[in-house]
A protein has these predicted regions:
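Amphipathic terminal alpha-helices
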Residues: 1-15, 36, 46-49, 326-343
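N-terminal Rossmann NAD(P)H-binding glycine-rich loop of SDR-like oxidoreductase domains
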Residues: 20-40
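NAD(P)H-binding glycine-rich loop region in Rossmannoid oxidoreductase-like domains
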Residues: 78-116
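Conserved Rossmann-fold NAD(P)-dependent oxidoreductase catalytic core, especially the SDR/UDP-sugar
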Residues: 96, 122-169
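Conserved beta-loop-beta element that borders a ligand/cofactor-binding pocket
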Residues: 141, 180-205, 216
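Glycine/proline-rich active-site loop of Rossmann-fold NAD(P)-dependent oxidoreductases
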Residues: 149, 177, 203-217, 226, ...
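Conserved C-terminal active-site "lid" loop/helix of NAD(P)H-dependent oxidoreductases
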Residues: 243, 276, 298-321
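Mid/C-terminal beta-alpha module of Rossmann-like enzyme folds, strongest
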Residues: 256-299
């Protein structure tokens, strides 16, 4: 895949080699792409980076990463991060991407959504402390900003909007906020090297098919040449990222991010309404946008935010620039998923 090759070049340019990566949430959208980049870069640039892909299901990991199983630079580990991380693992970098990340999971597994982020992250930070890990990247989210108070257009890293904490849906956002605070506590008490990535809404071909986010459902409609189903008026205005840009940004944060700092990550020309997102896919697929009412489970998982645009000046000041055009990335995502599902 050309995008993996492009981001692999970033890895080579940053001269990240002979390092051991422990990737939590390896089977997720970002984790899968990140691992593909590391393995491709090993093959092309002989970087000799080692990958430990961590998830809750060994069988799922074996299925996803079957092409890497025989590679000496790759291994998998079945771990529940809500328990102590096994001490026999060794790594230089940790990427904490383990979390429920879509609305249906927030509604049907609300406790797991919270514990994986808070208890799981603490277990990972304890492991990082014991093992004297070089750097941990914590995957946070645009959702920590809450609702825009209509006093600003873009969220910079100092902004804090409103979250009604006395709701089921607050679990994900508040868990991410608490996990960020936990990172700061470990930095203060144990001098851990942690960098926080506040990532916008992400799309890409490595998404899990069970993901219930509106953007993923639109893409799956496009993959199956179906009318695109919109379950609201579609006025919500959000920043999005193609997964290739997210991984490129994470690589830069591993190399150049400042300890203890948080960085917004969003894609190129990617501030669009939900309706625009749906129309882009319908136009490409030559279908229509249809409005349907959500069911009760879907309603419980929906974000209450209506405007969530990220200011990405801070990470750009480190030298990062998004590479992938929004519409082209949507089209590539659909075509790659079609090939994988129907070939």
């Amino acid at each position: 895949m050309g995008d993996i090759s492009t981001v692999s070049g970033d890895l080579a340019n940053l001269n990240i080699k002979n390092k051991r990566f422990l990737i939590l949430g390896a089977s997720g959208l970002i984790g899968r792409f990140f691992i593909d980049v590391l393995m491709h870069a090993n093959k092309i640039y002989r970087l000799e980076n080692t990958v430990i892909a961590v998830g809750r299901s060994r069988d799922k990991l074996l299925n996803i990463f079957s092409s890497y199983i025989e590679d000496d630079c790759f291994s998998i580990a079945e771990i529940d991060i809500n328990k102590k991380i096994p001490n026999d693992l060794d790594c230089d970098y940790i990427l904490q991407a383990a979390s429920n990340t879509h609305p249906k999971a927030y509604a049907t597994d609300p406790i797991g959504t919270i514990t994986t982020n808070i208890i799981g992250t603490q277990n990972i930070l304890e492991f990082a402390r014991e093992k004297k890990v070089e750097r941990t990247i914590f995957f946070s989210s645009v959702e920590i900003y809450g609702e825009n108070k209509q006093d600003i257009k873009y969220f910079d890293e100092s902004y804090m909007g409103y979250i009604d904490c006395n709701t089921l849906r607050a679990g994900y956002s508040e868990a991410k906020r608490t996990s960020e605070a936990l990172c700061q506590a470990y930095i203060s008490k144990y001098n851990l090297d942690i960098v926080i990535a506040r990532i916008s809404r992400v799309f890409g071909p490595t998404v899990n098919l069970g993901d219930s986010k509106a953007s993923t459902q639109f893409i799956l409609n496009g993959v199956h040449n179906q009318d695109v189903i919109l379950k609201s008026k579609g006025d919500q205005l959000f920043s999005y990222s193609y997964v290739g840009d997210v991984v490129s940004a994470l690589l830069l944060l591993i190399s150049k991010g400042v300890k203890g700092e948080a960085y917004n990550v969003k894609g190129l020309n990617s501030d669009v309404t939900l309706k625009q997102f749906a129309k882009s896919i319908a136009s490409y697929s030559e279908t229509k946008v249809i409005v349907e009412l959500p069911d009760e489970v879907e309603k419980k998982g929906f974000s209450t935010a209506t405007v969530a645009l990220l200011d990405d000046k801070k990470i750009k000041n480190l030298g990062w620039t998004p590479k992938f055009n929004f519409d082209e990335s949507l089209e590539k995502t659909i075509e790659i998923m079609k090939e994988e599902l129907f070939s």
